[in-house]
């Protein structure tokens, strides 16, 4: 009985406004809670598992990656894992997924879903034997190309749909939905694990064109953290080794020709006080912004220059910072 196997727990349902892409994960919500608790005099720490244990075991699989359309795919990373055993996930992982309304499938798919909801980074796992030519090509395909997705529906592709392909055919609608024939099965032995950052506009338009809405497209449309792909990839790879066995059989392939920079925002204390309608001490303001992972790169008696993480797509102006201060204060 599922009810007996799941220990008592609290499940919080959080409504996320469209501008808060950074909060579309457990870690993202915890980040805000941490800032609030610190500001209110509570002891709190914000941590996530270390990936220092990630290492390449051998170089037995050499799947290459080529990104033809860097506008639609600013960053694409992946790693090969050889000799996995696809099976049922352990109870702890199954229970975590059930608690958030997901149905466990197998250890490989469950790991990608776990990372997605924990850190907001969608992942996709390909059966490496189905990557024809040993090469991943990220590109658009000819208008009218037929492609069958995981739900067994044959779809007609647009030449504006970004696809993850091998050397012969498309395997996945990038950031939206996998193909019927490229995913992992119980017979899968070798996998290629993908972690990417796709252009939100491209994903949104493709999802609408095909009438699709998935957990992955929901996050890509709003804008994930372009600089968090490698952490999520390493954490997923370590979990695959732990739960499915195998060896990390390649270096991480990371195509990131134009890194996305953090935002620089000037905050003037007097203007902040004017917008807020009251005076908040400078030390309190600095405490709030730093607890939200913004860095103070310059400071004067009149204000601060802040380095805002790239994942905070909603904080690009001083008034956006003021809104954050008010949320936490």
Residue ranges and their predicted role:
Residues 3-329:
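RNA/tRNA-interacting regions in translation and RNA-turnover enzymes
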């Amino acid at each position: 009985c599922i009810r007996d196997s799941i220990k008592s727990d609290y499940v919080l349902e959080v409504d996320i406004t469209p501008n808060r892409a950074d909060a579309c994960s457990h870690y993202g919500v915890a980040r805000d809670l941490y800032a609030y608790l610190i500001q209110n005099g509570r002891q709190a720490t914000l941590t996530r598992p270390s990936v220092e244990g990630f290492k390449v075991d051998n170089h037995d699989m050499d799947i290459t990656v080529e990104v033809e359309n860097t506008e639609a795919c600013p960053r694409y990373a992946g790693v090969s894992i050889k000799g996995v055993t696809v099976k049922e996930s352990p109870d702890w992982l199954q229970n975590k997924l059930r608690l958030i309304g997901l149905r466990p499938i197998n250890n490989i798919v469950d790991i990608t879903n776990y990372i997605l909801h924990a850190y907001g980074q969608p992942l996709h796992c390909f059966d490496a034997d189905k990557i024809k030519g040993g090469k991943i090509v990220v590109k658009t395909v000819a208008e009218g190309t037929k492609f069958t997705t995981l739900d067994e529906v044959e779809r007609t592709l647009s030449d504006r749909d970004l696809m993850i392909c091998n050397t012969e055919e498309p395997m996945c609608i990038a950031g939206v939905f996998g193909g019927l024939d490229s995913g992992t099965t119980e017979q899968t032995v070798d996998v290629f694990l993908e972690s990417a950052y796709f252009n939100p506009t491209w994903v949104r338009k493709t999802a609408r064109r095909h009438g699709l809405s998935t957990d992955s497209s929901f996050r890509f449309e709003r804008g994930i953290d372009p600089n968090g792909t490698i952490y999520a990839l390493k954490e997923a790879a370590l979990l695959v080794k732990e739960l499915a066995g195998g060896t990390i059989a390649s270096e991480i392939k990371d195509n990131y020709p134009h890194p996305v920079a953090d935002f620089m925002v000037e905050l003037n204390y007097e203007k902040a006080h004017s917008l807020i309608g009251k005076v908040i001490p400078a030390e309190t303001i600095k405490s709030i912004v730093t607890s939200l992972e913004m860095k103070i790169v310059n400071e004067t008696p009149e204000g601060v220059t802040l380095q805002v993480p790239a994942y905070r797509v909603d904080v690009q102006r001083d008034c956006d910072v003021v809104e954050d201060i008010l949320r936490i204060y």
